């Protein structure tokens, strides 16, 4: 085991605070509409230019081990905020730095760190309660666009694209972000349920231009086993042929004689069919088949339910208005399932999301909800260079997360104004003793810091602006984009309540832990190995410089 070094009290804290300040100073220059870029070196490939706080934080590793521990603690604030709300990482970092800076002064003056922490916690709880009171729900597409625009550092085109995507697929719909192939951003919307399985044979294609198989008003047969014997399928194929409608077969696999017969029937025009593999694996495959069954108003033909292929009737088959099957994807548009059954299924999956223990499971369940409840929108981010596309894509991701947070918990006035209003509302809060009062003062001072930093980045005098905004009420604030005072909600400067709340909670949590730290244990630096000459002491040329 490597040797460890230990430092205590003020020495330990001051080193940790130095690390906090180095990281926070690099991150906070990106805050606000006039925030600056940060260039990140890559060990391979082009450097990355970003205004995303968490991207900057993740890149920072300091050579001094103790300073690096402090930096890692603040990095944790940014990461936690990003994971929970998807945005607000720079605000969280600025708040954490302010709480640590103010708290360090009181600890150095001899106040009890634990009472300071209790005061900080009390002030944060009161601040969050007040934040919820001034929050209002997002109701219009315009508000959604405004939230997205602010999060994308003031780029209106990104805000409009995200608002349009939500309009098209609904608040529950899946919205993904991809690299585009042109200079402009594009929005591609897939209506209905899409899964990542394509046709099993190219002979099923009936639209040669698009290279897809299109089925209008088809039946849908869902089976959880492999189909290789055509005799199993014959009874249901005859019933579908009599109805003169096409058929989509979704099974674990369709192979051998069964697949060959379906292809021949398709080519001869006897019965238009397409066979695809069922999506997913194991238990997830069963769940996805059940989703498709509910969406199309059919049943999964499975031994568990007492149904067999030979005895299947049209009543067990699902139906849809249109199905498109490509090489890699199948899209079911306007399934014939009953709305109440789909809603019940969505509710059931949401309950599973609440109980899911892993992020992967939660993500896959949310994907299923979105596919049942809405559609899938793909925002393709355009740009002239790879660096530009990457930087813009980061901002679109941030804006998308901020928008989802706004839909979830509502919105508050942006530009740091919500925290100023909260500060004014809780300014009369008192703790159980003088040290707790000091903890409350730390938070009251920290709540000004995001506005101060936004104004500083805009090149204005922070103290003057903070004083003027504090004198106002409601949505009155400073718009750093235009340099004017006014109603920020009217001018579209909004923040999601969830982002502001999460940033404050995480910043206070980590900063308070740092203030109550009294010792730091770290690995002792290794002594560099002494340089040895290749030539021994008695060798020719030893001891001479050449």
From Swiss-Prot:
Give the catalysed reaction(s), semicolon-separated: ATP + H2O + a folded polypeptide = ADP + phosphate + an unfolded polypeptide
Keywords attached to this Swiss-Prot or TrEMBL record, sorted alphabetically, are: ATP-binding, Chaperone, Cytoplasm, Isomerase, Nucleotide-binding
The subcellular localization recorded is: Cytoplasm
Q: Provide the E.C. number(s) assigned to this enzyme.
A: 5.6.1.7
Task: Give GO cellular component annotations, separated by semicolons.
Answer: cytoplasm
Nucleotide-binding is among the record's keywords: yes
At which positions is ATP bound? 30-33, 51, 87-91, 415, 495
Query: Could you name the domain of life of the organism this protein comes from?
Result: Bacteria
Q: What family is it from?
A: Belongs to the chaperonin (HSP60) family.
User: Any idea what job this protein has?
Assistant: Together with its co-chaperonin GroES, plays an essential role in assisting protein folding. The GroEL-GroES system forms a nano-cage that allows encapsulation of the non-native substrate proteins and provides a physical environment optimized to promote and accelerate protein folding.
Its name, as the record gives it, is Chaperonin GroEL 5
Name the gene for this chain.
groEL5
